[in-house]
Swiss-Prot record:
This is Phosphoserine aminotransferase. Coiled coil: none annotated. Catalyzes the reversible conversion of 3-phosphohydroxypyruvate to phosphoserine and of 3-hydroxy-2-oxo-4-phosphonooxybutanoate to phosphohydroxythreonine. Pfam families: Aminotran_5. It catalyses: O-phospho-L-serine + 2-oxoglutarate = 3-phosphooxypyruvate + L-glutamate; 4-(phosphooxy)-L-threonine + 2-oxoglutarate = (R)-3-hydroxy-2-oxo-4-phosphooxybutanoate + L-glutamate. The keyword Cytoplasm applies. Pathway: Amino-acid biosynthesis; L-serine biosynthesis; L-serine from 3-phospho-D-glycerate: step 2/3; Cofactor biosynthesis; pyridoxine 5'-phosphate biosynthesis; pyridoxine 5'-phosphate from D-erythrose 4-phosphate: step 3/5. Signal peptide: none annotated. Binds 1 pyridoxal phosphate per subunit. Homodimer. Belongs to the class-V pyridoxal-phosphate-dependent aminotransferase family. SerC subfamily. The lineage of its organism: Bacteria, Pseudomonadati, Pseudomonadota, Betaproteobacteria, Burkholderiales. The gene is serC.
């Protein structure tokens, strides 16, 4: 029996994608091979690779000025790879810290340069806001400005992206990429691990403006130097072939759903239903400012936290899994990525109401 999976990542995948992957497991398109067995330079895998790149470019409307790269190491590795590729002759990069992940990025950058905290969204209740551009205190000549536009742990999503002129804007989009249209031209670099909205764990997507490919530090490993990866069409080393294949199936699924405009409408509906339920109750609490509440990751707390384990056990009994909040913040978290259907959110909301009534 399939359950409703609210995991923050690895996360739910579309059932259509899983079934197609199962059907093609032993024999991909009459090749007699599984994708897992293919040479990454053979014509069979190259067709998968090129289709995935083309479909992602179409979905996000990536301009010709930007290259799409498939790497490894996830978003955490990019916290090191970004400064190694962008600091160049500069020492300083600016960070707007809105949650746990941008804080990790800031801390990692200290190994390669001098990160500057331009703004923070931390309050007495934790990370609950996204500082407006007027609050940012940028340094004189930063190599780039870093944002995490959706904080998976804290549930803060930044929707308003300012124009920084000549300063490259770098965004960790791991947990909201492909959930809504984006103006990719505003960014110097976008990066995201796949295991939330792109596909399965193993591949990392980096979208980088071509004029930024010549800034790498000499210490940057060749396999992580964007210029080298781009020159080799993401095949400098053996890529995570099966993860790219799954990502390609997800891209095709998204196109069949009507693209990102249609997906965004669904995601707004799902998030509104869940937040409305939280706000209308006297039992559940979300502390994030409404204007920057994440559509993908919804943290909430029970008024009586001694009942947390009862809540999770009851949810599991109804087939509602992976609702425990991150250990750093506690409480609950429902990650409602693209592949989580509206029916799953409705089932969660029904359970939340029942649980609240039983405890009243």
């Amino acid at each position: 029996m399939r359950v409703f999976n609210f995991s923050a990542g690895p996360a739910a995948l579309p059932e259509e994608v899983l079934r197609q992957a199962a059907d093609e497991m032993l024999d991909w398109h009459g090749s007699g091979m599984s994708v897992m067995e293919m040479s990454h330079r053979g014509k069979e895998f190259m067709s998968i690779h090129e289709a995935a790149l083309a479909d992602l470019r179409e979905l996000l409307d990536v301009p010709a000025s930007h290259r799409i790269l498939f790497l490894q190491g996830g978003g955490i590795a990019e916290n090191a790879i970004v400064p190694m590729n962008l600091l160049g002759s500069r020492q300083t990069a600016d960070f707007v810290v809105t949650g746990s992940w941008s804080q990790k990025s800031f801390n990692e950058a200290k190994k390669y340069g001098t990160p500057h905290l331009a703004a923070s969204g931390k309050t007495a209740d934790g990370f609950t806001r996204a500082p407006a551009r007027a609050e940012w205190q940028l340094s004189d000549d930063p190599a780039y400005v870093h944002l995490c536009t959706n904080e998976t742990i804290d549930g803060v999503e930044t929707f308003e992206i300012p124009d920084l002129g000549d300063i490259p804007l770098v965004a960790d989009v791991s947990s909201h990429i492909l959930s809504r249209p984006m103006d990719v031209a505003k960014y110097g670099v976008l990066f995201g691990g796949a295991q939330k909205n792109i596909g399965m764990a193993g591949v990392t997507v980096v979208i980088v403006r071509e004029d930024l490919l010549d800034r790498a530090l000499s210490i940057c490993p060749s396999a992580f130097e964007w210029k080298t990866v781009a020159a080799n069409n993401s095949l400098y080393n053996t890529p995570p072939t099966y993860a790219i294949y799954i990502a390609g199936l997800v891209f095709q699924w998204l196109k069949r759903q009507g693209g990102l405009e249609a997906i965004e409408a669904r995601n707004i509906e799902k998030a509104k239903l869940l937040y409305d339920t939280i706000d209308a109750s006297g039992f559940y609490l979300n502390k994030v400012e409404p204007a920057v509440r994440s559509r993908m990751n919804v943290p909430f707390f029970l008024a009586d936290e001694t009942r947390n384990e009862d809540f999770l056990a009851g949810a599991k009994a109804r087939g509602l899994l992976q609702l425990k909040g991150h250990k750093s913040v506690g409480g609950m978290r429902a990650s409602i990525y693209n592949a989580v259907p509206l029916e799953g959110v409705k089932a969660l909301v029904e359970y939340m109401k029942d649980f609240e009534q039983r405890g009243a």
